[in-house]
Amino acid sequence: TASQGLLLMIPNMYKIAGELLPCVFHVSARTVASHALNIFGDHSDVMACRQTGFAMLCENDVQEIMHLATIKSRVPFINFFDGFRTSHEIQKVAVWDYEDLKEMCDMDAVDAFRKHSLNPERPMMRGSHENGDIFFQHREACNKYYEDLPEVVEKYMGKINEKLGTNYQLFNYYGAPDADRVIIAMGSICNVAEEVIDYMNAHGEKVGMVKVHLYRPFRADKLLAAIPATCKALAVLDRTKEPGSEGEPLYKDVVTALANANRFNDMKVIGGRYGLGSKDTPPASVFAVYDELKKDAPKHEFTLGIVDDVTHLSLEEKAVPGVAPAGTIECKFWGLGGDGTVGANKNSTKIIGDHTDKYIQAYFQYDSKKTGGVTISHLRFGDKPIRSPYYINKADFV
């Protein structure tokens, strides 16, 4: 589910989480209609659910979705990833072996869940009504589950890492070990940032990024451990907007964690918004963030990918070099909705991915109108994994 469909579930989500009923909502995070309807992607919908008691796990790309969707817990989960940019992207991925997948399933927990069902042989009280004398105490009784949950997730990530050779953590750091400028983000922008970080560090800079996987419950100690001690400037990127708030959700969580640990004296912290309604976030946007962090007085609040000539929050983006892996071939096709261009390109990339050793990536840009609108197909092929979740702007083939 996603967007308004997810928001309609919020009253039930409070009950599901309150009764500790294990379930998973897989959410391709999409925009919630505000001043206008938009069917495309950002984190507006999942951020509206963060107070329900659901745990929240975020994946950055297609491969991570395949790997991390197997994590289980008594606490219900929202397992989310970027709508359209990740959910509609075609990539070559390594899939689970079913024997390995079977080992990830705790059958004792399944049996315990089944025994929790309504049964006259196992009577229990449900749907109770409580007054002010005991409601508060019972509401606090779930604390232990949420305190233990990050360790449960870490345990399962450890199993995944052991079986698949990955390195998933609650917060993954990427970049120079002695970075002085760091970005914190979650979702597909992390892959864009990885390419920029590789380029900048290869040219003498010292930058890095913390990728958030487990967003709720938020483990501040794990986040702080992931930030290099050398960091002097920090930018937190959110893919949502809360009008009237002092900052966006992830930014406020990070600021609180830093304040409680007395780390504010060590670094500047700024927050930005990006990608609302699937606005493209190219490498130029990430370069602009690192450039802003160099300043003595950077913007406390900023936006990426647009030109804000009203409130002047946008960062200036300059022409930047290509950061995709050497040897990547980029192709761009224009067509009209319904003319077969998108379908032909989907089949072509799947054939090349299935029958060659090439890595492939396909993403299709189109509007939300009926048949006849312009479609743009963005295809990439290469000998190295492709981490480029943004539109092609320097095509080898058109």
Annotate each predicted stretch with a short phrase.
Residues 4-57, 80, 101-102:
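N-terminal alpha/beta PP-like core and its mobile active-site loop of ThDP/TPP-dependent enzymes
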Residues 39-83, 95, 107-110, 256-275:
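Conserved thiamine diphosphate
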Residues 158-181, 314-328:
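Glycine-/acidic-rich phosphate or pyrophosphate-binding loops and their flanking alpha/beta elements
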Residues 233-324:
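Peripheral docking tails and interdomain loops at the edges
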